[in-house]
Amino acid sequence: MSTNGTLSKPEFPANAASKEYAASLDAADPFAGFREKFIIPSKANIASTKLAKPGLSSEPCIYFCGNSLGIQPKATQKYLEAQLDTWSSIGVCGHFTKIEDSPLKEWQNLAEQAAESMSKIVGAAPEEVAAMGTLTMNLHLLLASFFKPTATKRKILMDWKAFPSDHYAIESHLAWHHLDPKETMVLIGPDEGTYEIPTEKILSYIDQHADEAALILLPGIQYYTGQLFDIPKITEYAHSRGLIVGWDLAHAYANVPLKLHDWDVDFAAWCTYKYGNAGPGAMAGLFVHEKHGQVDYSEGEDAPKFRHRLTGWYGGDKSVRFKMDNKFKPIPGAGGYQISNPSAIDLACLCAALSVFDETSIAELRKKSVLMTAYLEYLLLKDTTDESRQFQIITPSDPAARGAQLSLLLKPGLLHKVAHRLQEAGIICDKREPGVVRVAPVPLYNTFTEIWMFVQQLKAALEG
């Protein structure tokens, strides 16, 4: 079983390259109404350097950058105002007082409100998810708990082009254990001249290093190429060879269906500001499988046994959290990995974003996403050849091996010119050195007509 099962690639009729056809797809879109739940930046505002209120310009930009930062849900202002009103009106009482007409729980239970909604997105029990921290911080906490090198098993396997923060985190944990990263960090990359890492190659690396590797950490979706890895197959195989398995789901969360519990993933972490739309630097999430989150009181209430982790008071069970007796009794599950009192303001933004997902499911959103990305690919490749195109799509063509993003590797020297031309045309997408434009139509708020318009502008920029 692959991460998303077998997906048939959509096929398009002869008139699919017309704007009218794109409009017909929009007319039939069951998610069209969700676009109204978001504030789309305007062309005028993205060209301005002054603080502006949304809605002052009626012409929206084309925002294909949800793989870097999602746009603001309209619910965010409502949730933030409710939180600020609670703080201003009752102060510290907000920790325990449930406000009847607020969309938010009291502060002591607010992280659980977010975790419950996130658990549906990642395919986990609510107790296996915690809303806390930021992505790299959470990876550090998880690695501190799960990376237990021995004299023989001390290597960590990861992908060759991991997001730099992941790379730094792994290096620092190896150094923390007095290990040389040059000897103990194993990078798995594609074959020369290619960009996709075949699942079989990952499995072969696991075989090659199984006797010396303690842990493997991979991205659910590779941030640069957009490749979606076969999470269940890799996890099952790594477990069979004795490795702990962790996943960085920064680009998979709220993008593709996940079943972390059923896939027996040991731990995972993700940010919520990309496809999750929770805001820049928003509070992140982590997953710890229930088998690792158990608390054993068989030797008495004062001698709980649990998986070692770095601890803080907010990971303590609520029944003893305020006793101040310095006897740590962790919350069972991922909640026991919490450290400090989380920001209620940040949680308000996260809960606002999650309220949109509570109205649908990732499985349903995925259907539209597969169609959108396939349509983008179709328009990009139509009436061109590998020789005539000034770009190469380095994202896998198989819908089951990618999410919303297509990564376009431009010919040398084109990146900055093309990115500038696109922004002048009111199109926001992400560029990554040395030459990649990452384009991510998001099913919650993007349209097929926008995809058609983007391709016209990209072709003009490449020809100009």
UniProtKB/Swiss-Prot annotation:
Pyridoxal 5'-phosphate binds at residues 135-136, 163-166, 248, 251, 273, 313, 341. InterPro entries: Aminotrans_V_dom, Kynureninase, PyrdxlP-dep_Trfase, PyrdxlP-dep_Trfase_major, PyrdxlP-dep_Trfase_small. One of its GO terms (biological process) is L-kynurenine catabolic process. The keyword Repeat does not apply. The modification N6-(pyridoxal phosphate)lysine is found at residue 274. Its EC number is 3.7.1.3. GO terms for cellular component: cytoplasm. Pathway: Amino-acid degradation; L-kynurenine degradation; L-alanine and anthranilate from L-kynurenine: step 1/1; Cofactor biosynthesis; NAD(+) biosynthesis; quinolinate from L-kynurenine: step 2/3. Keywords: Cytoplasm, Hydrolase, Pyridine nucleotide biosynthesis, Pyridoxal phosphate. Pfam families: Aminotran_5 (PF00266), KYNU_C (PF22580). Disulfide bonds: none annotated. It catalyses: L-kynurenine + H2O = anthranilate + L-alanine + H(+); 3-hydroxy-L-kynurenine + H2O = 3-hydroxyanthranilate + L-alanine + H(+). It is found in: Cytoplasm. GO terms for molecular function: kynureninase activity; pyridoxal phosphate binding. Its cofactor is pyridoxal 5'-phosphate. The keyword Hydrolase applies. Belongs to the kynureninase family. Homodimer. Catalyzes the cleavage of L-kynurenine (L-Kyn) and L-3-hydroxykynurenine (L-3OHKyn) into anthranilic acid (AA) and 3-hydroxyanthranilic acid (3-OHAA), respectively. This is Kynureninase 2. It comes from Aspergillus fumigatus (strain ATCC MYA-4609 / CBS 101355 / FGSC A1100 / Af293) (Neosartorya fumigata). The lineage of its organism: Eukaryota, Fungi, Dikarya, Ascomycota, Pezizomycotina.
